[in-house]
Amino acid sequence: MRRLTLLLVALASVAVSASAQKVLGNGQVSGSIESNSIYYTPDKKIERPEDHFGSNNYIKVDYSSGRFSAGIQMNAFLPALVGYEELADGYKFYLSSKYIQWRDKNFEILVGDIFDQFGNGLAFRSFEDRQLGFNNSLEGVRAAYNFGRYVTLKGMYGRPRLYTEYSKTWVRGADLSVSLADIMKASAITFNIEGSYVNRYQSLSQAPEYLHDTNLDPAAGIFNPETGEFDYPTYIESYGIKPNVNLYSGRLNFGWNGLTVRGEYVHKGNDYFFGETDAIGKTQKGWAALGEVGYNYKTFSVMATFRALDHMATAIDPYQAGTGNSINYLPALTRQYTYMLANLNPYQVKANGELGGQIDLCYSYRSKTDRYRYWNFHANFSTFYKLKANGEGKRDLLWRDINIDVERQWNKKWKSALLYSYQDNMDNQAHIFVGDVTHKFNRKASLRFEVQYLLSGDDKSEWDGLHSEGDWVAGLLEFSLAPHWSFYVQDMYNIGQSKTHYYNGGFSYTHNRTRVQLSYGRNRAGYICSGGVCRYSPAYTGVNLVLTSSF
C-alpha cells in the first residue's frame, strides 16, 4: 500500500504541474498521463499473485507548431499488472514511441513510430490499446501524398513493436485510394476504389532453435562445405517456410443519400502457423472477405455485415504467440456489451476459419410535445460458423447472439432500459435479462441501479472458469454528483456451481481533465475486450487505483 500511495502523490504532482504548461515558444504542448495500479490482497477463494503489487503507467507529450509536430511516450511497469506479463518481466521503464512529422497541404512525412490502418485493417493496422496491453506501432518512415481530392497515395516501411521490444521482422506497405465521385464531379455520392499491399519479412536465420535441429529429419543434411556447418535457412526453407509473406487488398466504398456499401477482399500468401500442428513448417495461404450494407433515415438505421476468414492470423513474429503479436486487425463482429453478465463469455474470433456476420437495427421515437420523453429500440443478431464443413457436410456453429433492448425516457427524472440476450457459444446456451433504471434528483445528483440474471443451459456436471458455471445474478448501484463525484457498489454471484461472490465498490473524482478512481473488489477470471479484441485476465482480489489526466 505504501508504493501505491507514493505513486499517487508523484503522478498527481506531475499532472498538476504539466497542466500549467501548454504554450512553448510559437507552438502548443499537449499530453496525457495514465496510471493503473493494483495492490493484490489475500483471498481464501482466489490465489494471490506472487507479486503483491502491479502498476502500468503511461506518459505522453506532443508538440506542434504550424506544419511541424513531434511527440514521445514513456511507459513504466512497476511491475506489470497480472495478466500483462508479456509487457515486462519485473520492473521496466522505456521509450515506447516517438515521432517527428511534417504536414503540408497535399504532402506529409513521419519518421518514428507509426500508427496507421489500411482500409478496414484486414491487411494492416498498427495501434495502441492499453486495456489489452497492445502496441504494435511500426518504427520507421511513412509518407503520403494527395493529388487534389482525386487520389491519395501513402507508403511506409519499418519494424513493428512486439510488446516492450522491437521485433526483428520488417514490414512495408502501400495504400492507394481513388475517388471516382470527385473525378466524375458527382458531389451527391461517395465512390472510392482502393487497394493495399503489405509485406512482412523475417530472415529465416531468426527462426527458433527447434527448427534448427536437423535430428528432426534424417534427410535434412543440408551441409555447407565452405563453412563446415549446416545451412539452417536452406533447411528451414525446404519445409516451405519463406522469409516473405505478402498480402493484397482491394476495396470499394459507396455512399448515397443515407445508403452505404463497403466491401474488401484480401489475399494472403503462404504463411507459417506456429502451434497449429506438430508438423514443422506448416504453411497455408489465406484470404478474407468483408461486406457491409447500411441505411439510415431520420431516426431509423440498419447495418448488415458479413465476413469470412481463412488463415488470416498474421503475426509480427510467426514463431511467437499472444494477443499483441499481430499486424492486422480482426475484431469480433458481434455486439459489444457493457453489462456484466451479457459480457461474461464474449466471442473469440477464429481467424483461421470462420464465416458469419451480424445485423443491427436502431429506431428512436421522440415526443413532439416533450423533449424529455422518448423511446429507443435496438435489436441485434450475430452468428458465426466454422468455415470448413464437417464430415456431414455441415458447418459447426461457433457463436450466436440474438438480443433486443428498449430504452425509455419517461420525464426529466426517470429513465429505464430493458435488455434480453440469447447467446450460444458451442459449449453452453444462456438467456440474459437486464433491467437498468436511473433517477435524477436534480441537475447534479442521480441514482442508477441495475439487476441482471443469467439463466444457463450448460451441463452443470462439467464446467471451468471460462464457462458460465450455471446461473448467475448481478446487481449494481451507482450514485453520481456531477460534475465531480461518482460512487458505486456491484456484485456478481454464481448460484449454479461455485457459489462465489465477485464484488466491487469504489468512487471516482473528476476535476477539469483529471480523474482519479479508487476501488476494491474480487475479479473473476475471464476475457477483457476492447474494440472486439479480447485478452485473458486471471482472477484477483485487490485495491485498484486509476489516474488519468490530459493537458
What feature does the model see in each segment?
Residues 2-5, 12-13, 509-551:
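In a subset of proteins, long, contiguous C-terminal domains/tails are tracked
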Residues 102-104, 254, 509:
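Active-site beta-strand termini and strand-to-loop segments that position acidic
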